[in-house]
Amino acid sequence: MRVYSASLVLPITAPPIPCGAIAVAGGRIRHVGDREWVVHELRARGVAFDEVHWPGVLAPGLVNAHSHLQYTGMAEVGRGSYAGFDDWDDAFTPVYRAGHDWAQDAAAGAREMIAAGTTAVADIVTDVEAASALHDARLHGITYWEVMSWTNAAWAERGRAEVEARLDALPSPPGTGLSPHAPYSLDVEPLLEIPDIVRERGSRLHLHLGEAAFEREHGEAVPWQKQRPASFRALRDEGFGTGATEFVDELGVLGPDCHIAHGVYMTARDRAILRARGTTVALCPRSNAVIGLDEPPVAAYLVEGNALAVGTDSLASSPSLDLLADVAELHRLARAQGYVNRDLPELLLRAATLGGAHAMGLDTGPARTGYLAVGAVADLAFFDIPVSEVDATIEHLVVAGAGSAVATFIDGEARSASPAFTRETGVRA
């Protein structure tokens, strides 16, 4: 048994614990509470243990709910600044086609995420060489095979069989799923059948939604279902202003086993649809800014009660894979958009941990993660944040926590440890 104690422990599903501790054995959490109580309980039971103490913050490992690890080698694109999705895509495509070692790049991205305190990832894979990134890195999360550019005719001929084979070949653990890229990049038939493929296997769905301004609803709401359009683009070509969220909802894509990335171009009705379907939104504000999109409606999501998670996206559209940098940007946006409640830091930290786990169905069951509780896997992140009053410390972590991760444990195993953490605790990764 090992006890991990810290000046402040943040369980997420329980109140913050100053001078708190958790006890870990067999890769799982056995006790959570005040350090004196945890130590007393173990001694009273005659359980031998050693202790690792960090004079800072201990939190659950971060959960990155939207990424493309294979694009880690495309940081030159992410360092640019663009005037919208099409402008960014014009820069992305030639670099993508130049050829990369996708496996090596994805592995490098996984290491970077772990060093930043991340223990679970929603990773979208476009090229099969990158398919084992999460598995090889022993990260929790879901590997999603990306599905795009299928017409109805090609799908009927060979699409379903090909996609099923790709899905079934993904290495596990972690979990697996499919990512129908976006409403505008697939015809109707694949969008109808991909959810069935996933749900027959008990897998997960993840798609880009509300990332391109083209998806935004415009004009009066007009019934369109009887038109039986071949695709979202065909529907728009016929003059309908139906939004992409309503479109995929009618096709049965959304649900509690699905989460979306970005959610920038969302009306109040769109946001209500997501709530009604139990679909989480993974917000990626730094990626949106690089691409030149509008700001996501962070304050509206918070006020209306949408389930939220946080993602970095990839280095092809983001400055780093440090999730707390996106959390800080969400804090800035929420305040600028008029969210004044004092619970903002707590809500955003929850989104970056439990919210991401919930988005992928990892918050329940035997391998539950995203929070510190008895029976959960011991996915831990230690941060070099000075501890003062509890609320002020949490706000410091949220607003200025990027770059502060000093150690990351996955299943109770030290996977990253800074020199400062090793000097203080003796623990090496």
Across the structure, where does each feature detected by a protein language model lie?
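Alpha-helical scaffold segments that flank or form the walls of functional sites
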Residues: 57-58, 75-137, 160-171
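Histidine-centered catalytic micro-motifs
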Residues: 60-72, 204-213
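Active-site gating loops and adjacent loop-to-helix segments of metal-dependent hydrolytic enzymes
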Residues: 72-104, 142-148, 212-255, 330-342
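His/Asp/Glu-enriched, well-ordered alpha-helical/loop segment
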Residues: 227, 250-254, 296-387
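Histidine-rich, glycine-flanked metal-binding segment
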Residues: 1-3, 11-59
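C-terminal cap of metal-dependent C-N hydrolases
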Residues: 374-429
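Active-site beta-loop-alpha junctions enriched in small/polar residues
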Residues: 68, 126-127, 146-150, 181-183, ...
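Histidine/acidic residue-rich metal-binding segments in metalloenzymes
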Residues: 49, 130-136, 159-280, 292-308
